[in-house]
Structure formats: C-alpha cells, structure tokens
Amino acid sequence: MSEIREVIAREILDSRGNPTVEVDVILEDGTWGRAAVPSGASTGAFEAVELRDNDPQRYLGKGVTQAVENVNSIIGPEILGFDALDQVGIDEYLIELDGTPNKGKLGANAILGVSMAVAKAAANYLGLPLYRYLGGTNARVLPAPMMNILNGGKHADNNVDIQEFMIMPLGASSFSEALRMGAEVFHNLKKVLKGKGYNTAVGDEGGFAPNLKSNEEAIEVIVEAIEKAGYTPGKDIYIALDVAATELYKDGFYVLEGEGVKKSAAEMVEYYEKLCAKYPIISIEDGMSEEDWDGWKLLTERLGKKIQLVGDDLFVTNVERLQKGIDLGVANSILIKLNQIGTITETLNTIELARQNGYTTIISHRSGETEDTTLADLAVAVNAGMIKTGAPSRTDRVAKYNQLLRIEEELDYTAIYKGLKAFYNIKA
C-alpha cells in the first residue's frame, strides 16, 4: 500500500514573495507527504537549475508554472505505482527522466519537490518521524545553530561586503539552551544597534542589515551584544562568517566596495588571519571565489587546521565538485543545500563522501524559504552537528528551530548536543 497513487504540484510563495514549487505525494492507503522547495539569492554557478518561467507579465518573470507543469504532466504520471519506500530508485529515475547533468530540462525545483514529498510520504506511511526514516536508529545529534544575525552583501542593501555574520552558541549543553542563548544575543544586538543610531530592520534571513562603517564594525557590535547578553565570546558563543567571496571576485581580485579596497587572494588570506587573531571566529564560509582553487589552497594551508573553512558555492552539494576539493586538499567542511543538487539521495551521497574524508557538514536553508521543515529533520538524520537556518526571527526561519525543539523533546535523554565537539577536524 506504499505505492504512489497521486502527485500534485502547485505554485506557492516563498519568504521573499517569490513563487516556488510545492508538491503533494499521495499513497494508495491515503498517506501523504508535502514539501516546498527553497530558493537562493547568492547562487553558485554550478548549482542545479531552478526552472523559472521568465514571463515578465507574471511575478516579474519569476513564476514557476513550467516547473509545476513538469511535475503534474511528466514526473507525476511517470512515477505512479512506484513504491515510496524506494527513495534511491525513485530519485535515480527522476535524474534519468530529466537526462541533463544539471536538471535543466525538468528543473531542480520540480525534481526536489517530488523527492522530498516522497520521503515525507514514506515516513508517514511507516509512522516514523522524517529524521528517523532518513537516518535510522542512531539519528540523535541536535545541530549547533549558526545564526545569521547581521547581514551584508547580497542579503542586504548596505555597504557591508561580507554577506553573513553568524553566532554559534557552542558552550550550550543542549539545543534548546543554544537557541535561547542565540535569541538573547539577537535581542541584545538590536539594543546595541539602536543605541548607536543604526536601523534595526531585518533582512531576508531575519538578521539586521544596518549601514555599518566596515566589516569589522559588524563583528564588534556582535561581540558587544554577546557580552551584553551575559556570555563570553570565544567560550560560550563563537562567531562565523559567510563571505560569499564569489560575489566580490572581479578580474582576479576581491573587491571590498564598502571599504574601497581590492585584494589579491594572498591579501584576503592575511585579512582573514588578522580577523581570526582579533575575534573569536571559528568558521569562514566561501572565503574565496568558487573558481579560485589556488586561493582556496592557500587559505586552507594557512587556516585549515585552526578554523572551519566551508565550501558552499565552491562545492554546491555536488559529489564531483567535492571530490575535486578533496583531491586538491581545499576547505575542510561543506555546506549542504538540498536544492543545489536536487534530490534527497544525491544530498545523502554528498554528505557520506564528506564524512569519509573528514569534512564536517552543515545543513543549510536558502535566503528564500518556506514553512517547510525538512532540513531540520535532515540535520538530525545525518548527525550533522551544525545547521544554518537564519536568525531567531521570521517564521520561515524559526519554523526550523521549532522543529528541532520538538525533535529534542522527542529524543529526550538520548539527544546529543555536541557544541564545540562538532568541529572534529580542527584544533578548536
């Protein structure tokens, strides 16, 4: 009775007011699963293709009726009768059905919507939580939140070049305590910014986006907020950055427009070294451009034993890109975004490859999110140890944190919060 009876896709809105794909998969016994697909603002050139209508008369060209139609008319009819419990078989069939290396024919947003909805329907059929279905009996690690509380770059209209300034409550003893600590720092940051006369409106991911004077000032106000909340920077709470350096890379140089300077890869590495020496920074994501492999190698040689170096645009949740990084010895961590690759199975394969090679994994949202909480379950399913899903603000972000609170409650005394121990490959 776990055979697929019906597949229905529709166009819904994401947290930015842009259309995205939602899919329902209904099984023979009436059990069903629903999934909504996220969308990024800062996207890697090597990501799977998100199919948009490009019709300027609808949603400024951002409609997804073609992707929806591909599910309803092509994918749906093709997988009727398939066993929802065969996730690998269904995902492989979807990849074959599309037939392109980047899912450009049917759209990664169409394929992922189906893949996620199938997994949810299967979990519901078995009466299991999604994290347990995907991860098995040992899925019990609650992730440390990487909370993006200050925004710059593509996520904000200000003169800060670094895209995200995050806090990580690694000194907490449980996920719920970490969430509370993060929320307290977030509220204190609002007070700090207000006191300095800065705007406290929030950006796409719930973080503040004030017009600060420099990247360093952003770190300084966060350190002040951590202390104001009664915590010790570098002991209770650490700082993580997402530079999104591909967005800064022009003609072989990294252009920091907010600061009016341009730097070579070697100068960027020196810049990061100085920041890490001065502030409690434990993680830098996309510190170099996605195609600057030499820059990445230098960065890894200089900082790879001391802090987490995360590849997002560099790896785009893709096993081939990750394997290249492993072979070249660059980065030591990978950001996992379901919609960068387009199926649950490929995502799990990438996580497995990272694990086998000593890379940490961070499960991540996109800047355009929905109320879907799949990634919270995925983080626990694979014992990732870290999750990146925005500030403790805006329902689209908080939905994931609330799901993790429920999972922690359900796991009870078996739940593990690793905190600093999640960084198993650096001398933290």
Curated annotation (Swiss-Prot):
It catalyses: (2R)-2-phosphoglycerate = phosphoenolpyruvate + H2O. The active site is at residues 205, 337. One of its GO terms (molecular function) is magnesium ion binding. Its cofactor is Mg(2+). PROSITE patterns: ENOLASE. The keyword Kinase does not apply. It is found in: Cytoplasm; Secreted; Cell surface. Binds a second Mg(2+) ion via substrate during catalysis. Mg(2+) binds at residues 242, 285, 312. The keyword Magnesium applies. Its EC number is 4.2.1.11. Belongs to the enolase family. Catalyzes the reversible conversion of 2-phosphoglycerate (2-PG) into phosphoenolpyruvate (PEP). It is essential for the degradation of carbohydrates via glycolysis. This is Enolase. It comes from Carboxydothermus hydrogenoformans (strain ATCC BAA-161 / DSM 6008 / Z-2901). The lineage of its organism: Bacteria, Bacillati, Bacillota, Clostridia, Thermoanaerobacterales.
